[in-house]
Swiss-Prot record:
InterPro entries: Ribosomal_uS10, Ribosomal_uS10_CS, Ribosomal_uS10_dom, Ribosomal_uS10_dom_sf. One of its GO terms (biological process) is translation. GO terms for molecular function: structural constituent of ribosome; tRNA binding. Involved in the binding of tRNA to the ribosomes. Keywords: Ribonucleoprotein, Ribosomal protein. HAMAP family: Ribosomal_uS10. PROSITE patterns: RIBOSOMAL_S10. It comes from the Bacteria. This is Small ribosomal subunit protein uS10. It comes from Polaromonas naphthalenivorans (strain CJ2). The gene is rpsJ. GO terms for cellular component: ribonucleoprotein complex; ribosome.
Amino acid sequence: MATKQKIRIRLKAFDYKLIDQSAAEIVDTAKRTGAIVKGPVPLPTRMKRFDILRSPHVNKTSRDQLEIRTHQRLMDIVDPTDKTVDALMKLDLPAGVDVEIKLQ
């Protein structure tokens, strides 16, 4: 039995609206070219928290708390055609979205 080729796309961004818009654009492009798309699956949001001293000298108890959230989405394109790969390469995504593509 031959194994099917699969493209795994992982998106990361700080803004969830931007990542959902990009995921919808990728799904639409892949479906238009006749590929089967599984996803987008929302992965757990990673939160990094930082404590920063407000005062440069004294008042150690006075601090600011900052956090940055990294949203992630995962999708698989099963049995892609050459047309699908070309369309995905030509796709223009916003600057705030990090895209990782693996061919399996």
